[in-house]
Design a protein with these regions (language model features):
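Structural alpha/beta surface segment adjacent to cysteine/selenocysteine redox centers
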Residues: 10, 17-118
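C-terminal cap of thioredoxin/glutaredoxin-like
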Residues: 4-5, 10-31, 109, 113-198
Length: 198
């Protein structure tokens, strides 16, 4: 069985714009996804990237154009300037890590739910009520938002170190075997790779 390690942050517009295509690809190929939320700002700093405020204006403008194009392409509405952004991604990341450990729900729906809440629904995904609601909607015990936070925080740090050591430098980032794919616009390539065509 193929395995896909998925490095992401819940506050990335491009994680949101990936929708559930990764999950669809994994289902087609019988692949297993391991969800690995990371501190994207720390990942950028460690691998030569720049946080959005430090990027050149042309890069910022292109980002907005690309967000609009991908939104239209995939039928996912997006607010390019959400009410609660930037927002601390750690609480939602901890909830995802705890949910993955606990099992019983739909992790893909949980990840997409947090990203959608941020980028399409103007919700504060660091707020406990929002976290509990997203857990419940994805079939998990909402009480996970209060349990296992220390171990989840440790896993969050480990995910960052692992991402750096495995050559990830942005989000979303997908690794299967030795093959790396950066960006939701590379999901088609991941699909072709798993099909043995690329």
């Amino acid at each position: 069985m193929a395995r896909i390690d998925y490095y992401f942050t819940t506050v990335s517009p491009f994680v949101y714009l990936a929708g559930v295509r990764l999950e669809d690809i994994a289902a087609r190929h019988g692949a297993e996804i391991t969800y690995k939320p990371v501190d994207a700002q720390a990942l950028f700093a460690r691998t030569g990237g720049l946080a959005l405020p430090q990027r050149h204006d042309s890069r910022k403008a292109y980002r907005l154009q690309e967000m609009a194009r991908q939104s239209r392409k995939h039928g996912l509405p997006i607010n390019p300037q959400p009410m609660f952004w930037p927002v601390n991604p750690a609480p939602s990341a901890y909830a995802i890590i705890s949910a993955q450990t606990a099992g019983g729900g739909d992790l893909g729906a949980l990840v997409h739910g947090f990203a959608r809440a941020c980028w399409a629904e103007d919700k504060d995904i660091s707020d406990d009520a929002v976290i509990r609601d997203q857990l419940e909607k994805a079939g998990f015990d909402p009480a996970l938002s209060d349990r296992g936070m220390l171990s989840a925080a440790e896993s969050y740090s480990v995910n960052l170190e692992e991402a750096v050591s495995r050559g990830a430098f942005g989000v979303p980032f997908y690794i299967t075997g030795e093959e790396r794919f950066w960006g939701q616009d590379r999901l088609e390539d991941l699909d072709l790779h798993l099909s043995g065509k690329l």
